[in-house]
Amino acid sequence: AAGASLFAEAGETQLGATVKSNVSQQRVPVTGDAGHWVHVSESPRHVRVIYNGETIADSKHAKLVREAEVLPVYYFPHEDVRSELLSPSQRRTNCPYKGEASYWSIAQGGKQAENASWSYQDPLPAADAIRNHFAFEWNKMDHWLEEDEEIFVHARDPYKRVDVLPSSRHIEVLIDGRLVAETRRPRLVFETNHPVRYYIPQEDVRMDLLVPSATKSRCPYKGPADYWSVKLGEQQFEDMVWGYMEPIPECPKMKGLLCFFHQRGAD
């Protein structure tokens, strides 16, 4: 099958099927030697949840739950939740680390979100700090705010870093043996528990080979991403390239640069 490959500093050790670089691509296990873990801390941020124009939860004492292999989740004290808008449902789920969760649906202004909130009323010892706290299904709510800034996708992990560093590495991107990008001025993005990514100025990319895609995504740490496919003759490699045209203020050095998927082959 045809494939996409990315080379950096020719002659160095190959770290994977498609990447050559002296930058380690190994992921750090989230669980570590201690096995599964659940970490609960009180967030110093003012966090709000809005549904159908109404603030459902509003707290300066929300708990942030970080758990191995699970995205961070905000849990709100009962007194900071509009509990009169919640009605209990029959749904129950069980977590071997936190206990049994009960669910509530939310009704507001003629609109209803089924099983949109859950709580551990009698949690296991590891999660006792979230007893009588309520969490909300992210995508069933309309808006989430930390202080006065809207946040997207999921709660942000305060222990996660995204470092964007200028580099003079020689980077070449080849797809099906054809050079589609070459640069000596990439920006390398080092993100906790993610492989190193190489972001390339558009001037160093064969933009005439890129076709804008309808695909969109959003990262809570970097912002909204646009995608491009690569067209080589009659063959098109879908969504092979992405870039943050308007990154969040914390990542301005990524603005307008393009990155290629170099871990997967091109179908």
What does each of the following model-derived ranges do?
Residues G3-F7, G11-D267:
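Terminal leader/tail segments of proteins
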